[in-house]
């Protein structure tokens, strides 16, 4: 819950906490930081630096600098699994153990080698409107009702129908947790002229911190999986594919399911378009980060659902975070 987020960030002692935005509903969006920030020696924004043939004009990354990781909590309020994961990751950073009391010594050790950025809940308005704290054992249709919302006659907007009206307004019975209280879905904001303060704050955070890797945490009914970002360089898609293989293998070691490993592909080779430049894409283009979307499993009941317990969902989250850190430590890009 948002109260759990407030409690956890209020107990931060080893890091720092900042309110980077206030939602239309008056709720804080927190950024939690661990580790020192290195001097970036920045003299250009990322786009201009790339045009100058050297991204180091935006941020110098070499063996003397600390790698940076950005964990972006759910921008869709019903996708609570990422909030659970990040609340527990903060607890690991502070105590070395998750809220079950399970120690994660290697994860904590790796965290201490990074500049760590966490936004536990990127859409607190949506989270506040969602009446469920978990969808484990709950029909997927119920999750869809409160996640994407309904029309006035009670019919579901569903996916991708909930993206066909934006900002979401007008024929609305239940305003889905996809949206903040102004009806903005941060995943599909106007990134060159953002409508939501939450979106602006997240992009500003990435712009100022230059993360080496960034994940946007989401959830669906299917097995967990990494999704490729659209409209980013092929070499970044190859790195995301390589990470996906590693995460899949890590899950298989402990009998956790994983979906498809998505291979790099060109976007919209035939008329459409059908691929969107979303928040994950924008994170790359504002900072050069290796950005991807991670879909956890809700553990809901449906035809495609992955039957996961609460314990397994937390393991899915924390093992992902650990593998992200391992990947960057072993495969960091220097500029």
Positions of the model-derived regions?
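Soluble metallo-hydrolase cores and metallopeptidase-like ectodomains found primarily
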Residues: 3-69
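Surface-exposed patches in mature extracellular/periplasmic domains of secreted proteins
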Residues: 17-21, 99-107, 260-264
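Generic recognition of flexible, low-complexity loop/linker segments
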Residues: 17-19, 58, 104-106, 202-204, ...
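A mature extracytoplasmic/lumenal domain signature
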Residues: 33-36, 75, 122, 190, ...
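Metallocarboxypeptidase
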Residues: 169-335
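Active-site/substrate-binding loop(s) of hydrolase catalytic cores
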Residues: 66, 80-237
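Active-site histidine-acidic residue metal-binding/catalytic motifs
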Residues: 71-78, 82
């Amino acid at each position: 819950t948002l109260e759990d987020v407030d409690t956890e960030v209020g107990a931060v002692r080893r890091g720092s906490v900042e309110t980077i935005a206030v939602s239309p509903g008056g709720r804080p969006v927190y950024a939690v930081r661990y580790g020192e920030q290195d001097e970036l020696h920045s003299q250009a924004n990322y786009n201009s630096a790339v045009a100058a043939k050297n991204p180091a004009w935006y941020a110098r990354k070499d063996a003397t600098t600390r790698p940076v990781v950005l964990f972006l909590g759910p921008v869709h309020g019903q996708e609570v699994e990422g909030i659970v994961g990040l609340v527990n990751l903060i607890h690991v950073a502070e105590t070395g153990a998750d809220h079950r009391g399970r120690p994660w010594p290697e994860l904590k050790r790796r965290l201490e080698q990074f500049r760590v950025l966490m936004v536990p809940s990127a859409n607190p308005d949506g989270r506040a409107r969602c009446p469920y704290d978990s969808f484990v054992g709950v029909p997927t249709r119920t999750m869809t009702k409160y996640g994407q919302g309904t029309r006035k006659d009670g019919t579901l907007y569903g996916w991708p129908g909930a993206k066909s009206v934006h900002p979401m307004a007008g024929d609305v019975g239940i305003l889905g947790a996809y949206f903040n209280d102004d009806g903005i879905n941060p995943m599909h904001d106007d990134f060159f002229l953002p409508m939501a303060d939450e979106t602006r704050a997240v992009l500003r955070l990435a712009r100022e911190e230059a993360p080496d890797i960034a994940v946007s945490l989401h959830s669906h009914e299917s097995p967990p999986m990494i999704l490729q970002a659209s409209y980013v360089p092929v070499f970044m898609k190859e790195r995301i594919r390589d990470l996906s293989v590693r995460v899949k293998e890590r899950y298989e070691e402990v009998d956790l399911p994983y979906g498809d490993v998505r291979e790099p592909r060109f976007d919209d080779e035939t008329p459409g378009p059908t691929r969107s430049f979303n928040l994950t894409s924008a994170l790359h283009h504002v900072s050069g980060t290796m950005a991807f979307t991670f879909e956890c499993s809700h553990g809901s009941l449906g035809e495609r659902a992955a039957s996961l317990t609460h314990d397994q969902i937390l393991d899915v989250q924390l093992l992902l975070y650990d593998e992200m850190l391992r990947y960057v430590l072993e495969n960091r890009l220097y500029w």
